[in-house]
């Protein structure tokens, strides 16, 4: 990963965090990995407002479980990844690719905010849908 950045999405207390929040919450409670997308994502409950001091430890634990490594043993992560942190849950997505079918997907893409540009293969998206597009990145 050549760079890292945060993207903050402000939400009111009872507003959903992202369009795919229900999907992430269902993944958290269901360990069935019926597609490569689900096999490369780890989701955990986390109360950010009450436990912000332990966020880094949870991040390290989840990163190791997903096979990304640990800063003590690995100079850099073993795989590129994206991370989503809400007030109630955290998700880490292990990626294999940065660009596919003219799309560049970051954390917001996995959250449900796909950016379509003139380079994007809109026909691929129409024919296979967003889930298949996201799956091709892992």
Could you describe each region identified by the protein language model?
Residues 1-138:
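HIT superfamily nucleotide-processing domains
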